[in-house]
From Swiss-Prot:
HAMAP family: Lipase_chap. InterPro entries: Lipase_chaperone (IPR004961). It is a single-pass membrane protein. May be involved in the folding of the extracellular lipase during its passage through the periplasm. The lineage of its organism: Bacteria, Pseudomonadati, Pseudomonadota, Gammaproteobacteria, Vibrionales. Pfam families: Lipase_chap (PF03280). It comes from the Bacteria. This is Lipase chaperone.
């Protein structure tokens, strides 16, 4: 069965050749976040994270502005090793990745390896070995690690043997890989529903006391947002179901409800969540 290899946001570039760059300017501190990102921090933990964070604003900001922001941020930080040419290559790669279509017959190892190799081959078409390591090094290693774990599950080992072999293999990996696996296990355990104290203690073990406290605050903020949003949806539904209102009146009342219920920086996010709640 024909199946798209990866689910990613297709970047609406129009013609990839129509990417223009503004003249160089002196480095300057500037808030490069779009309106919908004002409740987040700029993700510059890695070159790829920053590129994807920047591209997520496409639609709110023109591509030319995003390009200038990427270059300006690199000049300010001096750590990401990004320039106009590399950014343009990344745009072309993302489009090619979105178009990547290969034959997937299931979740067997051969199919997964085929997908993994197709991604590596595509990266080599656009980037040098040094650039691949800079942008995709961690992602590629984690994907290879997932393949290794899948191989173990198909080799007839008992559950306990698989766990021990996996721990041995993981111990040989870089620290960031081990942390990633630990976080994945934590999220899986949390999804199964543990009491708050057990959850907190596991977080302390994985990310330290300060990290666990930050995660707890995030949980509280997320729960509060969910509560407010669900109440908002109930009120919005009542407006939509009111037969005495015209479509224009409904639109105005919902807009007023949205703007009085949430901060301005959240409005675009709320509109997107409304579309999801409405089924698209």
């Amino acid at each position: 069965m024909k199946k798209t290899a990866l689910t990613i946001i297709t970047i609406a570039l129009g013609s990839l050749g129509a990417v223009y760059f503004l003249p160089s300017e002196p480095a300057a501190q500037k808030d490069i976040r779009a309106t919908s990102q004002h409740d987040t921090s700029v993700d510059n933990t890695s070159a790829k994270a920053f590129l994807d964070y920047s591209l997520s604003t496409l639609g709110e900001k023109p591509l030319q502005t995003i390009t200038q922001d990427v270059v300006r941020e690199e000049r300010a930080l001096g750590e990401l090793q990004l320039d106009e040419q590399l950014f343009a290559l990344y745009l072309r790669y993302k489009q090619a990745l979105a178009d990547l279509d290969i034959e997937i017959t299931g979740s067997d190892i051969i199919s997964l390896e085929t997908l993994h190799q197709a991604i590596l081959d595509l990266q080599r078409e656009y980037f040098s070995a040094q650039q691949i390591d800079l942008i995709f090094g961690e992602e590629n290693q984690l994907r290879a690690l997932a393949l290794e774990k899948a191989r173990l599950s198909e080799q007839g080992y008992s559950a306990e043997e698989q766990k021990q072999l996996w721990r041995d293999h993981l111990a040989l990996q870089p620290e960031y890989v081990q942390e990633s696996d630990a976080n994945r296990r934590l999220m899986s355990e949390l999804a199964q529903g543990e009491d708050a104290q057990t959850t907190y203690l596991k977080r302390v073990e994985l990310v330290g006391e300060a990290g666990a406290q930050r995660l707890e605050v995030l949980d509280q903020n997320r729960a509060e947002f969910d509560r407010v949003f669900q109440h908002y949806l109930v009120q919005r539904s009542a407006i939509l179901d009111d037969l005495g209102l015209s479509d224009e009146q409904k639109h105005k009342q919902i807009t007023m409800l949205r703007e009085t219920s949430f901060d301005a920086k959240q409005w675009r996010r709320i509109e997107a969540l409304e579309r999801i709640a409405d089924g698209g």
